[in-house]
Amino acid sequence: MSETTLNDIPQLRRGFRFQWEPAQNCHVLLYPEGMVKLNDSAAAILGQVDGDRSIAAIVAALRERFPESDGIEEDVLEFLEVARERSWIELH
């Protein structure tokens, strides 16, 4: 498996849906076998994943939204690599 890069374009895998879940009071990733509760950082990243934007564009959007945060690029790359390993997303 190749390394995740800023040029990759992530998208949720078929059957997965990202949404706010009032009963859980957090964003979740729903899929046929269950649900993953997401922390705020994971939700901010997955909220940018639309199948059209590159990881570089996602990083830029998050830097604009959270200018005080350091290490956004590394955090995004690390999280999306984990998401890919868990088969939540595909990279193109």
UniProtKB/Swiss-Prot annotation:
GO BP, sorted A to Z: pyrroloquinoline quinone biosynthetic process
Q: Which GO terms describe its molecular function?
A: quinone binding
Q: Superkingdom of the source?
A: Bacteria
Name the pathway it acts in.
Cofactor biosynthesis; pyrroloquinoline quinone biosynthesis
What UniProt keywords are attached to this protein's entry? Answer: PQQ biosynthesis
Keyword Membrane applies: no
InterPro entries from the entry? PQQD, PqqD_bac, PqqD_sf
Q: Which Pfam families match?
A: PqqD (PF05402)
Function in brief: Functions as a PqqA binding protein and presents PqqA to PqqE, in the pyrroloquinoline quinone (PQQ) biosynthetic pathway.
Q: How does it assemble?
A: Monomer. Interacts with PqqE.
Note the NCBIfam families from the entry: PQQ_PqqD (TIGR03859), PRK02079.1 (NF002535)
Q: Which family does it belong to?
A: Belongs to the PqqD family.
Q: What is this protein called?
A: PqqA binding protein
- Species source reads Azotobacter vinelandii (strain DJ / ATCC BAA-1303)
Could you tell me the gene encoding this protein? pqqD
